[in-house]
Amino acid sequence: MTIPLIDAATPVRVRFCPSPTGTPHVGLIRTALFNWAYARHTGGKLVFRVEDTDAARDSEESYQQLLDALNWMGIDWDEGVEVGGPHEPYRQSQRSEIYQDVIAKLRDGGFVYESYSTPDEIEARHKAAGRDPKLGYDGFDRDLSAEQIAAFKAEGREAALRLRMPDEDITFTDLVRGEITFKAGSVPDFAVVRPNGAPLYTLTNPVDDALMGITHVLRGEDILSSTPRQIALYRALHAVGVADYLPEFGHLPYVMGQGNKKLSKRDPESSLFLLLEWGFIKEGLLNYLALLGWSLSADEDIFTVEELVKAFDVHDVLGNPARFDVKKAESINGTHVRLLAPEDFRGRLVPYLQAAELVSAELTERQSAVLTEVAPLVQERIQLLAEAPAILRFLFVADDDVEPAEDALKGLPENLVEVLDAAITAVEPLTEWNAETIQDALRTALIDDLGLKPRLAFGSVRTAMSGRRISPPLFESMVILGKESSLARLRRFRDR
C-alpha cells in the first residue's frame, strides 16, 4: 500500500500542537520556534492547534500560558486557536465528530480491528511463551473468529481498536537524521481507539495533520519511535480518502541540561517564565534557543530574528543533543540587551523596577527622569534585566535607606573617615555639579593629595553613594543623585 509524497512545489505547512499541561518549557518553545522559522523562511503557513483530550491533565491555565509564551517570544501563527482558519476547530476536544467519521472509514476499510485483550492477558501470554513480558501487544486479536468475538462480547468486554501494521520494513528519510528503517515486526499493532470509543493520540495527531494538509512534521526526537506507526496510519488514511500525501518528518535533537541529562521540567532553566523572571529578553532567548540544534554559521552566534528567518532550513538542523548552557545564554542575552534602542531598553526595565517596589505603578516625574539618565549607564553593564533593581536601587531610595553590603565594606582603606572628610571638603564648594567637575575635585583630593590608589579612593565614595562595590559610573551617578543627596550620603557613611 503506497501513498504519494510531497514535492518541491507543495506549499509548506507546518504545525505546533502542544498539550496544555504544566508551564511552557524551553524544549517546547524551541520546537515552536523551528516550525515558525521554517514557515517564515519558506513563505509557508504555521498551524497552531491544541491537543487537549486528556481532561485529567489539561487545564485552561496552561493553555493561556502557551499563548502568553508564544506571544512574548513573538512567534505568531497563520491558522489555529485564537485566529481561526479553514480547518476549524483547532482544539482536539472539539473535533470528536471528525474523529468518529475517520474511525468508521478505517473500520469499513479493514485497517483496524477489535482487540479485547487486557494488558494482564498480554503479559501472561508473553510469560507463558518464555518472552519478555514487557514486549507489548502480541497480535492475539488480529484474526479472531466470529465465535471468539461473540464470546468476548458475551462477557461484557468492550474492544479497543488497533491498526494492522504491515508485515514489511518501514523506511523513511528523516529531514534531520537521514534514512531510517524500522524492521518488519519491530512495531506491534497499536491501539488507536480506547474501549470506550474515545480516539487516542496515536490516531488524532496524524488525522489532524492529514486533514490540515501538514507537509512537514518537525518535532522532538522523543517521538521518533512513533513515526513508523504514523506512516502506517497515513497509508490507511490515504486509502480511505482522508490523507492526500505523506508529510516529511524531522526529529529535532534533545535539549540537555547540566550533567548531560535530558533537560527536565524540574530544571529551573527549563521554565520559559522563570527565564523571563531572570531578565532574559525575547531577542536574546530566541537567538539562544535557535542555537540548540542549528547555527547561522560556524563562527557566528549572534543574529537577529530577521537573520534567522532568512537563513533557517530544517535540513541544516543537527541530530546531536544540544546542551542548554545558562552562562552562554546569559552572554548572548547581554549582547542583545546592548543592541536595544536606549528608549526600548529603558521601557523594559520598568516592570523589574516595579516588581522590586523601587518605582510606582505610574512613574513619578522624578523616577522617570532618573531612569532616563541612568538607563544608558547600565545598558552596557548587565546581561539580564533582573540585575537592574539591585544595581539601581540606590538611585530610587532615600539617603537614609542606603545600607552598605558586606562585600563593599571589605577592602576599604583604614583611614576611611579621613578619605570621606576629604571627599566632602572637595565637592561641597562646587558650583557646577557635573561628572567632570566632580571627578576632578575627587581625584585631586583623594589621589593627588592623599596618595590613594583610584580603587580605594573612588571605592570609598562609591560605597557611600550606593552601598555597593559595583555600581553605574560613579560621577554620573552623583550627578543623578544631585549635590545635596550626594553630600548627605557621604556624611552618613562617614558617621556610621
UniProtKB/Swiss-Prot annotation:
Checking InterPro entries in the record gives: aa-tRNA-synth_I_cd-bd, aa-tRNA-synth_I_codon-bd_sub2, aa_tRNA-synth_I_cd-bd_sf, Glu-tRNA-ligase_bac/mito, Glu-tRNA-synth_I_codon-bd_sub1, Glu/Gln-tRNA-synth, Glu/Gln-tRNA-synth_Ib_cat-dom, GluQ/Sye
Instruction: State a single Pfam family of this protein.
Output: tRNA-synt_1c
EC numbers for this chain:
6.1.1.17
Q: Does the keyword Kinase apply?
A: no
Q: Where does ATP bind?
A: K265
Top EC class for this record: ligase
* Catalytic function, reaction form: tRNA(Glu) + L-glutamate + ATP = L-glutamyl-tRNA(Glu) + AMP + diphosphate
| Motif extent ('HIGH' region) | 18-28
- Keywords assigned by UniProt, alphabetized: Aminoacyl-tRNA synthetase, ATP-binding, Cytoplasm, Ligase, Nucleotide-binding, Protein biosynthesis
Which biological process, per GO, is one annotated for this protein?
glutamyl-tRNA aminoacylation
Superkingdom: Bacteria
Cellular localisation: Cytoplasm
- The UniProt annotation puts motif 'KMSKS' region at 262-266
Q: What does this protein do?
A: Catalyzes the attachment of glutamate to tRNA(Glu) in a two-step reaction: glutamate is first activated by ATP to form Glu-AMP and then transferred to the acceptor end of tRNA(Glu).
Subunit structure as annotated in this protein's UniProt entry:
Monomer.
Family named by the database record: Belongs to the class-I aminoacyl-tRNA synthetase family. Glutamate--tRNA ligase type 1 subfamily.
Q: Which NCBIfam families did the record assign?
A: gltX_bact
Q: What is this protein called?
A: Glutamate--tRNA ligase
Source species: Renibacterium salmoninarum (strain ATCC 33209 / DSM 20767 / JCM 11484 / NBRC 15589 / NCIMB 2235)
Q: Which gene encodes it?
A: gltX
